[in-house]
Amino acid sequence: MSRVGSKIINVPENVKVFIESGMVHAEGPKGKLSTKINDGINVKINEKEIVCFPKQKDRQSLAFWGLQRNLVNNIVIGVGEGFIKKLEMNGVGYRASVKGTNLELLLGFSHPILYPIPQDLEIKVDKQNNIEISGASKQLVGQVASEIRSFRGPEPYKGKGIKYADEHIVRKEGKKK
């Protein structure tokens, strides 16, 4: 019995969910999202709740049961409330700014890095070194945050670089004479 898969998904009042041609579609104030239903999983929508359960008790269906439930839950939460990832920049001269449809990053390289902002996301920069990425798709928000972080990941000696706001960097001691 899957502990994650057997949980019921509650649908908020402002979100509309329906199943069409093997896809679960959700519409809400933050936009529209959809996810494919796995072949071994059934998804039922009752009033204001969604239930996922496997068609058969084979190994593969049971493995995808919890995954399918979480994918459906993520689109329901995404179109209702949205997801937010926060990044912090530490380092002398490290700055960020939004210029049109690009995020400009000054990270100590000889050139600025221009990162194109996807249409479905909103990026805000606060005090030139705090970046907030928000959007309906949890996968896209996390992927963009990861790509921005990868330009200059945090280093363990001085803590310079881009890190998630809730991330703890294990610091190392420098070389001793």
What are the language-model segments listed below?
Residues 2-146, 150-164, 168-177:
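N-terminal intrinsically disordered, cationic/polar leader segments
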